[in-house]
């Protein structure tokens, strides 16, 4: 099952701030997830889909949905290696990832809309760093700091890899997260 998505909008104002992501760019979170998945596998971009397979009540596969390639990005391996290494270094600097049993690569981002609202928090990532199988993108509107988005992604990885139980992660109350635990954006 393919998901139709909105076309991304590239910034058309403020050339210098736009260069670092502070312009009028407009991307969906799922579009960013597809982007980071393309980065994780060094250039293969897939169509978005929400189903892996359809099974009956006994677990028999009725239909298997094979990912479809949308396009590829051809870069020299040295560039891909530099990108992967840089994204790994971003996460290595985050203290709240120190005890995670899986290596994650990611990129933080804090988008400033205006001075009357809190910044938007963003974190795109993939794991395991050595052989990617999952990407996670978190955007928190008016979330103040990308560290909050990165800590939320950490919890997704904990759940996905069975490192924490759902009850430990979903408590029904908001967590007090530590914006000083990372090194900032």
Q: Could you say what each language-model-derived stretch is?
A:
Residues 32, 145-154:
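Short, charged, low-complexity patches
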Residues 53-57, 104, 145, 157, ...:
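Short, surface-exposed, charged/polar-biased interaction segments
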Residues 133, 145-147, 163:
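Intrinsically disordered, low-complexity acidic/polar segments
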Residues 1-141, 181-185:
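Beta-lactam-recognizing serine transpeptidase/beta-lactamase-like catalytic domain environment
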Residues 61-68, 154-185:
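Short, gly/Ser/Thr-rich active-site loops of penicillin-recognizing serine hydrolases
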